């Protein structure tokens, strides 16, 4: 089993399946062997075999939460949102334990009226997840609660507290005032019974900070060139970062084209800073203090080209034309083989066909850009 997990980690999925087959032959009633093999099948896009394995695991071991969680992600990946969002609640028994909070008030999953009640929403998981589900705050307003209290992480405070939704925004570690219901933000798609056909995708649903806009506008001179914002790497701590992030070198052909390039990248390596210094790409990382800066910089661009990070979500939420580069093994949110996103109408997706090889999506993107 450990050898199979090790092979999976280095993207040797066929090899990992062989190891899990050995485990299953030796011990056919051990549920998590099927769960692990299912993940390998999913990585190879053998989705029916993956679901069979996850189902086999839950039938052998109904108390193994990881398998329900993996079923959730597979359903969502395939666009079966009804089952996917219901099973998504298993995250609290799986990897998301660290974000779980226990309040004496009632968890709201859409079943009770919140009219004239106070509801508290708190963040979980990544920055991109927060932006993706922030759209539901406007829908909560339509249910006429007495008040919505929204907790945000520090980098979002300035951006979210200046939106026009008339809600109470609090920073982290601030005790919310009295409330009747609470909900983690990633449970809102379930609460609003979200399916592919009714994803609330009216964009922009995020406004930039007017004061920040003025500051950023002063940094830019009039240009006849297409302005392109670039982001090639995500948070190195993300478990799929080795697949979803690119090297700056991968953009070498792209940045040789006659456009005006601006880097939206934070936390560049020493090597990347050297490359940027010797190129025509304009580096803004020292001016990007928080997401209100990033949003205003995105607003100044004509097109965003990025990998799967918070930048894609910010750009999509702002309604900015975005070219998103995805690995062959990508997040459930971007679904399977779609070139568009039901969540963000302004995003166009360019996917790898072989894991680790960015040449095909980059070639398609460059051809699109030239046209």
Q: What does each of the following model-derived ranges do?
A:
Residues 1-371:
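Alpha-helical solenoid repeat scaffolds of the TPR/TPR-like class and their adjacent stem/linker regions
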């Amino acid at each position: 089993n450990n050898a199979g997990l090790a092979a999976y980690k280095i993207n040797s999925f066929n090899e990992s399946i062989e190891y899990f087959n050995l485990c299953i032959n030796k011990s056919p009633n051990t549920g998590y062997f099927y769960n692990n093999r299912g993940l390998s099948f999913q990585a190879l896009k053998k989705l029916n075999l993956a679901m069979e394995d996850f189902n086999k695991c839950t039938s052998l071991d109904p108390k193994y939460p990881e398998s329900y969680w993996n079923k959730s992600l597979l359903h969502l990946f395939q666009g079966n949102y009804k089952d996917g969002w219901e099973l998504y609640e298993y995250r609290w028994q799986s990897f998301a334990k660290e974000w779980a909070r226990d309040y004496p008030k009632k968890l709201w999953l859409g079943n009770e009226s919140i009219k004239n009640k106070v509801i508290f929403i708190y963040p979980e998981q990544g920055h991109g997840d927060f932006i993706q589900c922030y759209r539901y705050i406007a829908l909560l307003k339509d249910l006429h609660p007495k008040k919505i209290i929204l907790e945000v992480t520090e980098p979002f405070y300035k951006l979210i507290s200046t939106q026009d939704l008339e809600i109470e925004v609090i920073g982290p570690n601030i005790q919310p005032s009295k409330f009747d219901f609470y909900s983690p933000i990633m449970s809102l798609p379930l609460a609003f019974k979200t399916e592919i056909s009714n994803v609330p995708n009216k964009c922009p649903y995020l406004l930039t900070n007017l004061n920040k806009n003025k500051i950023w506008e002063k940094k830019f001179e009039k240009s006849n060139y297409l302005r392109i914002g670039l982001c090639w790497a995500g948070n190195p701590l993300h478990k799929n970062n080795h697949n979803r992030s690119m090297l700056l070198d991968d953009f070498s052909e792209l940045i040789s084209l006659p456009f005006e390039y601006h880097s939206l990248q934070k936390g560049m390596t020493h090597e990347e800073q050297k490359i940027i210094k010797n190129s025509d790409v304009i580096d803004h990382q020292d001016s990007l203090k928080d997401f209100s800066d990033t949003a205003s910089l995105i607003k100044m661009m004509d097109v965003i080209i990025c990998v799967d990070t918070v930048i894609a979500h910010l750009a999509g939420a702002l309604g900015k034309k975005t070219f998103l580069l995805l690995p062959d093994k990508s997040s459930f949110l971007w679904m399977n083989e779609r070139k568009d996103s039901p969540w963000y109408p302004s995003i166009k997706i360019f996917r790898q066909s072989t894991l680790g090889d960015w040449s095909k999506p980059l070639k398609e993107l460059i051809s699109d850009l030239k046209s």
